[in-house]
């Protein structure tokens, strides 16, 4: 049976519609376009239901048939979400008070999608974190109420089944996946005490000793907590509003890894600067981080926080794994030019490098073959529209919003895991009438005084770093064999011996210093890099002693002992470099 075709929901000033995904890319005939301005829209987790509000009512339809499920007379609704099993629809509207009703009305409402009845209404003044978080099987749900977590079981919102009360719970994240459910909580520091993140397994909330893991840290005004798909670890990005050192306008960020087995670590990032994005691979064993002052670095780490692959530097601030995890897109949106780097994750080979200028939204289609990029208001009010691409860089469909109209949101219909299996990665761009938009290499600005002179390394504003595989002996990475290294060292030794035998010859005219024979490399391990650097320093000192000896200088005992250690040092250096 052929896999289904995902729909793309489009919301703007001219209404809400559903579009068939590629290859057709036509408006769905089963869904009648709503010409009224849509305030919000969402799909259910399995993609079988679609809901939107238009300032008059909230409507829920089946997808792809378009059959009506329920409609609710809720003209003020500005946000809505489905529970994971489609049993509950949560709606939220702005909290308001009147003279007749100084307490205001309960503005968070939970609706039974079977009967259409209101199950429970809560007061929720802030839109941030307005929706309850459900476990995937809806056995529990949780809300943050006055810095205290309230847990409900089996959608019974009349009774609080459990509470988690710490000093002041600011943020929480409920784990995905099967039972038992886990929750990550963040408590900001106060009165000199550090902030901390703790992981608990529901319902074991008996105190600090019941926590699965605990990570304390300073310098945190806010955090972002991201569970992996298997709920075995959380990545915590801790941020401060102001960088007291003055190094960054964005404040300071640190990345922490916290696992449910109690392990925790600070993820060491080789380049200073902000952390732009963190993304878990769907395999839950690797994650990608985009970080550092521009041009930013991007690195994939494993669950031991070790570097797996370094993508070098580039104009990027976001990372997006495909739903199957076989492709990674590194992109530079917002104030960057919209360059996208598409990588085959298994081979760590670049597939394409298209460019989508003025992009404010990017998302993967559930099939893992297509993506959508969009320019939306209010982030950017000019040139609104969206494009559907194949990941090889081909534009398959393009829509430009008419003048005077605005595009507000595009949203792919989700599907359960396993509906779209992983396909082999293609490197050849698909044919299309719209073609592809490969990024053209832009010429760097050069001052007039340097324009007629050859470009040197020192004339570059930023040092560029190429991609490098951090795994030893990784596929596609050519490393010199031991025999090749020995032959190279033997040739260098013969050349040095010839030079020693000609001490009386006039020295050749001064020239540019030759490059050091040992190529500077990085293994991602600061300790190993330090050892390599020290060994090279010692070998350089031995070379200088040999030159002095060849010139007739009498060597002292300690200098001769140093020279005798050359072979041993070369062997140590060879072992360390081969271990990269």
From Swiss-Prot:
GO molecular function term, any single one: mRNA binding
Recorded family membership: Belongs to the WD repeat EIF2A family.
Pfam families for this protein: eIF2A
Gene source species: Danio rerio
Comp. bias regions, Basic and acidic residues: 494-505
Listed PANTHER family: EUKARYOTIC TRANSLATION INITIATION FACTOR 2A (PTHR13227:SF0)
Gene Ontology CC terms, in alphabetical order: cytosolic small ribosomal subunit
Task of the protein: Functions in the early steps of protein synthesis of a small number of specific mRNAs. Acts by directing the binding of methionyl-tRNAi to 40S ribosomal subunits. In contrast to the eIF-2 complex, it binds methionyl-tRNAi to 40S subunits in a codon-dependent manner, whereas the eIF-2 complex binds methionyl-tRNAi to 40S subunits in a GTP-dependent manner.
GO biological process: regulation of translation
WD repeats: 21-62, 72-121, 270-311, 355-399
Coiled-coil segments: 481-578
Annotated region described as Disordered, given as residue ranges: 435-530
Keywords for the protein's UniProt record, in alphabetical order: Coiled coil, Initiation factor, Protein biosynthesis, Repeat, Translation regulation, WD repeat
Domain of life: Eukaryota
Upper classification of the organism: Eukaryota, Metazoa, Chordata, Craniata, Vertebrata
UniProt-recorded name of the protein: Eukaryotic translation initiation factor 2A
Record carries keyword Repeat: yes
């Amino acid at each position: 049976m052929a896999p289904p075709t995902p729909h793309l929901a489009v919301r703007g000033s001219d209404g809400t519609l559903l579009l068939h995904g590629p290859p057709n890319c036509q408006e769905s005939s089963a869904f009648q376009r709503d010409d009224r301005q849509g305030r919000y829209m969402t799909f259910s987790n399995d993609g079988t239901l679609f809901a939107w509000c238009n300032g008059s009512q909230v409507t829920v339809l089946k997808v792809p048939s378009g059959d009506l499920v329920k409609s609710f007379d809720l003209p003020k609704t500005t946000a809505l979400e489905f529970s994971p099993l489609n049993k509950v629809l949560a709606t939220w509207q702005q909290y308001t008070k009147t003279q007749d009703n100084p307490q205001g009305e309960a503005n968070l409402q939970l609706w039974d999608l079977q009967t259409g009845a209101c199950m429970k209404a809560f007061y929720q003044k802030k839109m941030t974190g307005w929706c309850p978080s459900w476990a995937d099987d809806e056995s529990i749900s949780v809300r943050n109420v006055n810095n205290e977590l309230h847990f409900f079981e089996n959608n019974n919102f009349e009774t609080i089944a459990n509470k988690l009360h710490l000093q002041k719970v600011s943020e929480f994240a409920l784990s995905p996946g099967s039972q038992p459910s886990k929750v990550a909580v963040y408590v900001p520091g106060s009165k000199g005490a550090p902030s901390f993140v703790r992981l608990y397994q529901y319902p074991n909330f008996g105190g600090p000793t019941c926590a699965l893991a605990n990570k304390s840290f300073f310098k945190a005004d806010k955090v972002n907590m991201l569970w992996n798909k298997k709920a075995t670890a959380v990545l915590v990005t801790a941020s401060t509003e102001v960088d007291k050192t003055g190094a960054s306008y964005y404040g300071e960020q640190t990345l922490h890894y916290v696992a449910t087995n109690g392990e925790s670590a600070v993820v060491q990032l080789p380049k200073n600067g902000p952390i732009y994005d963190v993304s878990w691979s769907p395999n839950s064993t690797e994650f990608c981080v985009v970080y550092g002052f521009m041009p930013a670095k991007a690195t994939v780490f494993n669950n031991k926080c070790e570097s797996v692959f370094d993508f070098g530097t580039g104009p990027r601030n976001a990372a997006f794994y495909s739903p199957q995890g076989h492709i990674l897109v590194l992109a530079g949106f917002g104030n960057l030019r919209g360059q996208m780097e598409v990588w085959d994750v298994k081979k760590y080979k670049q597939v394409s490098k298209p460019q989508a200028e003025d992009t404010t939204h990017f998302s993967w289609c559930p099939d893992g073959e297509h993506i959508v990029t969009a320019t939306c208001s209010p982030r950017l009010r000019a040139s609104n529209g969206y494009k559907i691409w194949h990941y090889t860089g081909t534009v398959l469909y393009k829509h430009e919003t008419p003048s005077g109209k605005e595009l507000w949101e595009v949203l792919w219909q989700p599907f359960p895991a396993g509906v779209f299996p992983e396909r082999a990665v293609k490197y050849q761009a698909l044919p299309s009438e719209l073609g592809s938009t490969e990024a053209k290499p832009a010429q760097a600005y050069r001052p007039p005084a340097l324009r007629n002179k050859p470009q040197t390394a020192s004339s570059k504003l930023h040092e560029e770093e190429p991609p490098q595989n951090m795994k030893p002996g990784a596929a596609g990475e050519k490393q010199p064999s031991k025999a090749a290294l020995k032959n190279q060292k033997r040739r260098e030794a013969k050349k040095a011996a010839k030079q020693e035998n000609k001490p009386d010859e006039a020295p050749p005219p001064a020239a540019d210093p030759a490059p050091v024979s040992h190529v500077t490399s990085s293994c991602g391990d600061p300790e190993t890099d330090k050892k390599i650097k020290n060994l090279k320093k010692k070998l350089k000192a031995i070379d200088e002693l040999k030159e002095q000896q060849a010139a007739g200088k009498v060597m002292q005992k300690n200098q001769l002992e140093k020279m005798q250690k050359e072979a041993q040092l070369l062997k140590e250096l060879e072992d360390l470099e081969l271990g990269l």
